[in-house]
Amino acid sequence: MTPEEFRQSLAGQGLNLTDEQMQQFELYYEFLVETNKNLNLTAITEKNEVYLKHFYDSLLLALTVKDLQTEELSLCDVGAGAGFPSLPVKIAFPQLKITIVDSLNKRIKFLQELTQKLNLQDVHFHHARAEEFGGKRSVHRERYDLVTARAVARMSVLSELCLPLAKVGGRFIALKAQKSDEELKNAQKAIEVLGGKVIADYATELPQVHDERHIIVVAKEKETPKKYPRKAGTPAKSPIE
């Protein structure tokens, strides 16, 4: 997907990017690939692939969950890595207030430099484990309208890391490359225990390559019990299932 195809495909979905926004995506690509020579941020570095499998893939979130396009929402991106999905969404919809949490300080430094280069406002960074960031004494607990994760971890694990950060009435949104009904079924207990309820499971695909994508939306209906999330590493080792 060339940058022009990226722009046209989004325009076909009602998302019209300005020349300035296209320039921001170009700078993002250049800085990502340059930094990736010394810091392992992504295995995808070919330009057309980055535009499709990182930038467009991230924007599927806003094309699916449409209030992201117009509302001034607070969004916490857990384990953002090289900034996906939150920073492409921020470029397209600058009114969003973004908080990024990542456990690797080198990635946080890359993202801080990147947002300065792109002149993005209202983006905050935290070098932390998600289990600590959403812990019972954390000021970030139950604070965000939306919490996102674009990760391979199981839904039961992601739910324990992300749901404590969503405010009651907010949502946790998981972006999954593949989704098995069994994985979602196994996560039901965790989602319920943590105060959530699955309200949507959108099946979509990347254009051109037709790779399957799932966007799973979990509503935060009640407060997460204080004992969750458990200490760092425990959710992955022994998920609530």
Swiss-Prot record:
Location of this chain's protein in the cell: Cytoplasm
Name of the encoding gene: rsmG
EC code: 2.1.1.-
Alphabetical list of Pfam families matching this protein: GidB (PF02527)
Organism phylogeny: Bacteria, Bacillati, Bacillota, Bacilli, Lactobacillales
Name of the featured protein: Ribosomal RNA small subunit methyltransferase G
GO cellular component, as recorded: cytosol
Enzyme class per UniProt: transferase
Keyword annotations of the record: Cytoplasm, Methyltransferase, rRNA processing, S-adenosyl-L-methionine, Transferase
Record-linked InterPro entries: rRNA_ssu_MeTfrase_G, SAM-dependent_MTases_sf
Family note: Belongs to the methyltransferase superfamily. RNA methyltransferase RsmG family.
Purpose: Specifically methylates the N7 position of a guanine in 16S rRNA.
UniProt-listed Gene3D superfamilies: Vaccinia Virus protein VP39 (3.40.50.150)
Listed SUPFAM superfamilies: S-adenosyl-L-methionine-dependent methyltransferases
Binding site for S-adenosyl-L-methionine: 79, 84, 130-131, 150
GO molecular function terms noted in the UniProt entry: rRNA (guanine-N7-)-methyltransferase activity
